[in-house]
Amino acid sequence: MVSVRKRKMARSSVRKNTRRLKDRQAKINIHSNPIIAANWDKSLTLQQNYKRLGLRAKLGTMVGGQEKPVIKASQKQEEQHVPVSEIENTTDPSKIPEGEARLIRDPETNEVTQVIYGTMKKKSTEDTPEVSTVVKQLEETAQKNAKIKKERKPSEQESQWLQKLYEKYGDDYEKMKWDKKLNVYQQSAGDLRRRITQWKKLNLIV
């Protein structure tokens, strides 16, 4: 027999909390650029892919959500270590690593007579990344496309409209702009000149 509570729950308009699916990640359109599409790794996130390709997901400064590079302790020590032979005879603070010091003792009494504190900054463990082959390919493609200047071609309807204006006014663009019937959108004289010059060029009109 079903309990009173179960019957009330069955009649209730409030839906029970069912299992919810995790929100799917937004699909990234990588096919718009064939170079990026060819080098994209679907198993990585957007930021991981961009970093691997030598690109940046955001132009501004990243706030949180950044993965720190994994650096082994031995590698870190090697990069920051300065051999003793390089600093044992120097009195220049800029050649002694910051956080370290050189003690100069009296040869007779062995007492410390001078302490030279180091001012040399430690090298960053993150080297400046080299320009990747993907970035080079993208730059080459951008340069090629920049050289190719595509001219805008007027549509058939626009060509007919320009032809009517030219047949009526010739090269008098000041009169053209005041024609309320033909120049419905009130194009300026300079704009009409540019359009008709291009139209004449396409139609081989001198």
From Swiss-Prot:
Q: Which UniProt keywords apply?
A: Nucleus, Ribonucleoprotein, Ribosome biogenesis, rRNA processing
Q: Where is this region: Disordered?
A: 1-20, 69-97
> Has the keyword rRNA processing been applied to this entry?
yes
A GO cellular component annotated for this chain's UniProt record is:
nucleolus
- Lineage, top-rank taxon, reads Eukaryota
Q: Entry's InterPro entries? A: Ribosome_biogenesis_Nop16
| Stretch forming the signal peptide | none
Q: Where in the cell is it found?
A: Nucleus, Nucleolus
Is Nucleus given among the entry's keywords? yes
A Gene Ontology biological process term: rRNA processing
Q: What is its main location?
A: nucleus
User: What Pfam families has UniProt attached to this entry?
Assistant: Nop16 (PF09420)
Family per record: Belongs to the NOP16 family.
As for what it does, the entry says: Involved in the biogenesis of the 60S ribosomal subunit.
PANTHER family, alphabetized:
HSPC111 PROTEIN-RELATED (PTHR13243), NUCLEOLAR PROTEIN 16 (PTHR13243:SF1)
The record's subunit annotation is: Component of the pre-66S ribosomal particle.
Protein name, UniProt field:
Nucleolar protein 16
Which species is the source of this protein? Meyerozyma guilliermondii (strain ATCC 6260 / CBS 566 / DSM 6381 / JCM 1539 / NBRC 10279 / NRRL Y-324)
Lineage of the species this protein comes from = Eukaryota, Fungi, Dikarya, Ascomycota, Saccharomycotina
